[in-house]
């Protein structure tokens, strides 16, 4: 952290892309260093608690600016600016093209954390908490039958969008993966004292190799004022660059928002998750255009 304090002030903008376990501390250090930030660390802490610090130091931090959370929040923020939104659902997953397996496009420890942290969602205006991996449902996506289950993905939406009576985020995996993870969790492999060992074992099994093809799929459904809006994102490993779809969809969303800060299109200090940024239609349209220019399939169905 001392090294960050020493070098961060030399830059106009810093992208914080560290493991979630240290993300909050690093973001706090960057704000104390008075530098603008785009954060894609997805730390478990409530990042909105740093808003006063960001304002005090006159810096802007766009947080959770990946694909989900991130792009889905931007889409919701856009519609919430002119619709009386009644429900929001996000189904999202990054998977290998080889069926019925799993490869982690980011830290296995962060994936495991998704499977152990209680999942919070909003139902009829109340926060409901269930076990992660609960409420499985089959979902057809791009001709594939996948399985969705609860994960704690709403994050900042629980605070910023309290007026929306129904909100849910679910993770997508191949059928069968959920049952394997429940077995490991219930057998104690995901307990804190065993996590380092489990992560090492799963890292070898889940490691995305250079020539592994994978894809990212997201479906966002928003209902309100007797309207229904469904957006779908689909991207695959880039055959030429070998960049994974998760890298592309997360990284390019982050880059689009970096452009907003560096071109002085925002100019307000504070902590801003995607739903607060997406309320401005010009930002929403900029992000959608930025992704489409990079051949990421993103359409309103």
Which residues fall in each region the model found?
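Short, acidic/turn-prone active-site loops that include or flank metal/cofactor-
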Residues: 1, 20, 41-46, 66-68
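Conserved Rossmann-fold cofactor-binding substructure of NAD(P)-dependent oxidoreductases
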Residues: 1-11
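Structural motif
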Residues: 12-13, 36
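Beta-loop-alpha module in the N-terminal Rossmann-like domain of NAD(P)-dependent dehydrogenases
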Residues: 13-30, 43-47
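Rossmann-fold NAD(P)-binding glycine/threonine-rich loop
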Residues: 40-64
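Adenosine-phosphate binding glycine-rich loop
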Residues: 57-96
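C-terminal catalytic/substrate-binding lobe primarily of soluble NAD(P)-dependent oxidoreductases
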Residues: 82-301
């Amino acid at each position: 952290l001392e090294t960050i304090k020493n070098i961060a002030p030399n830059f106009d903008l810093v992208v914080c892309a560290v493991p979630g376990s240290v993300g909050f501390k690093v973001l706090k250090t960057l704000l104390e260093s008075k530098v603008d930030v785009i954060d894609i660390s997805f730390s478990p802490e409530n990042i909105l608690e740093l808003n006063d610090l960001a304002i005090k130091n006159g810096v802007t931090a766009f947080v959770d600016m990946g694909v989900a959370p991130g792009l889905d929040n931007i889409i919701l923020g856009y519609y919430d600016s002119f619709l009386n939104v009644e429900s929001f659902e996000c189904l999202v997953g990054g998977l290998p093209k080889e069926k019925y397996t799993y490869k982690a496009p980011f830290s296995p420890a962060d994936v495991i954390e998704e499977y152990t942290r209680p999942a919070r969602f909003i139902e009829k205006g109340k926060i409901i908490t269930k076990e992660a991996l609960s409420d499985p449902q089959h979902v057809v996506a791009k001709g594939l039958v996948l399985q969705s289950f609860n994960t704690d993905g709403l994050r900042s939406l629980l605070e910023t969008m309290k007026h929306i009576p129904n909100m849910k985020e679910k993770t997508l995996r191949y059928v069968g993966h959920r049952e394997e993870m429940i077995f490991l969790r219930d057998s104690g492999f995901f307990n804190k004292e065993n996590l380092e060992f489990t992560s090492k074992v799963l890292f070898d099994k889940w490691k995305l190799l250079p020539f592994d093809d994978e894809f990212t799929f997201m479906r966002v459904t928003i209902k309100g004022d007797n309207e229904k809006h469904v957006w779908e994102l689909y991207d695959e490993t880039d055959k030429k660059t070998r960049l994974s779809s998760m890298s592309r969809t997360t990284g390019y969303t982050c880059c689009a928002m970096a452009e907003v800060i560096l071109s002085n299109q925002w100019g307000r200090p504070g902590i801003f998750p995607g739903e607060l940024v997406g309320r401005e239609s010009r930002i929403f349209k900029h992000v959608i255009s930025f992704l489409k220019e990079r051949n990421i399939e993103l359409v309103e169905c």
